[in-house]
UniProtKB/Swiss-Prot annotation:
GO terms for cellular component: cytosol; protein-DNA complex. One of its GO terms (molecular function) is phosphorelay response regulator activity. It comes from Enterococcus gallinarum. Its main location: cytoplasm. Residues 132-231 bind DNA. This is Regulatory protein VanRc. SMART domains: REC, Trans_reg_C. Member of the two-component regulatory system VanSc/VanRc. Binds to the promoter regions of target genes. Activates the transcription of vanC1 and vanXYC in response to vancomycin which results in vancomycin resistance. It comes from the Bacteria.
């Protein structure tokens, strides 16, 4: 069965181009030209991945991403304008898994889609039995087998990337983990010095796990070194 992908871009030519290239790779693809139609479809169908443009005519791509992340874990790839670093950081902090800058080569989109699907499938279908079933600290319980995060008795929705970041920090509890180490462990890619991906995801995690994100008690920053969950 081919993976089902949603492509959302108000520029019909771009949406149709990306759709065609993905279909040529064997994916089942549904294009949309506005966010409202896309979210209605996503709520009815089992989607494996979404490609979202930031600029949409009704609701913007960030709002659409937030709607998706309320109930869905599947990977999301954002399309951003050239040079708009703020868009990239915002998208990643809201739960996007990757981004492509316009103008782009459709083959790059295809490659990134395949990469995200492979990661998601490994995440969902891993059969390895962890030596530790859960981690607990200061009212938070991270359940490894069920991929759940419980904070003071209430479940906190984490994206697959957020869960893996938190798990890696717990696995190395008491040690400072650099952004480079964390990125290469979670994303399985080479880290670049100007990469803000880890920082954006840590900020998002803190918003979900701390009453005062600017004064984090769980995930602490060791300036110039990295991040730590203390023992």
């Amino acid at each position: 069965m081919s993976e089902k992908i949603v492509v959302v871009d108000d520029e019909k030519e771009i949406a149709d181009l990306v759709t065609t290239f993905l279909q040529n790779e064997g994916f089942s693809v549904q294009p949309f030209y506005d966010g409202t139609s896309a979210i209605a479809y996503i709520e009815k169908e089992a989607i494996d991945l979404a490609v979202l443009d930031v600029m949409l005519p009704d609701i913007d791509g960030f709002q659409l991403l937030q709607q998706i992340r309320k109930t869905h874990f599947f990977p999301v790839l954002m399309l951003t304008a050239k040079g708009e670093d703020l868009d990239k950081i915002t998208g990643l902090s809201l739960g996007a898994d990757d981004y492509v800058t316009k103008p782009f080569n459709p083959l790059e989109v295809v490659a990134r889609v395949k990469t995200q699907l492979r990661r998601y499938q490994r995440y969902n279908h891993s059969t390895a039995s962890p030596t530790v079933e859960e981690y607990e600290k200061d009212g938070l319980i991270l359940k490894i087998n069920s991929h759940q995060c419980i904070l003071y008795g209430k479940e906190v929705f984490l994206t697959p990337i957020e869960f893996k970041i938190l798990l890696y920090l717990f696995e190395h509890q008491g040690s400072v983990v650099s952004s480079e180490t964390l990125f290469e462990a979670v994303w399985k890619e080479k880290y670049l010095d100007n990469n803000n991906t880890v920082m954006a995801h840590i900020a998002r995690l803190r918003e979900k796990l701390h009453e005062e994100p600017r004064k984090p008690k769980l995930i602490k920053t060791v300036w110039g070194v990295g991040y730590i969950i203390e023992k």
